[in-house]
Amino acid sequence: MGSDTAWSPARMIGIAALAVGIVLGLVFHPGVPEVIQPYLPIAVVAALDAVFGGLRAYLERIFDPKVFVVSFVFNVLVAALIVYVGDQLGVGTQLSTAIIVVLGIRIFGNTAALRRRLFGA
């Protein structure tokens, strides 16, 4: 069985790790430190942008795991950095809104491409 098959060991480890993480989160209810709370929604939206971009690339058969991981981490860090700088300048709310709008447009663009690819609509 090659690493590109549907049931490869690497894929199964990833799925198992995701399942364990979800269960642990539901059982232990981890708290988010107050320092990080303003940046968490932005980080989640940035991560969703990378995930939907990765799904689109996978369906278009141009997915590269290295590009996905770098995109995921870079999106989250840059979005958080922009909000942090905005907070320091006193315009954090406006920059947060701008980031949500930009990433939201990208997410909807990727979901539209996914819909066209999957359903031909």
Curated annotation (Swiss-Prot):
GO cellular component, one term: plasma membrane
Domain of life of the organism encoding this protein: Bacteria
Localisation: Cell membrane
Membrane-spanning ranges: 12-32, 35-55, 67-87
Keyword Flavoprotein: no
Coiled coil feature spans: none
Similarity section: Belongs to the sbp family.
Annotated membrane topology: Multi-pass membrane protein
Protein name according to UniProt: Uncharacterized protein Mb1855
Assigned keywords, A-Z: Cell membrane, Membrane, Transmembrane, Transmembrane helix
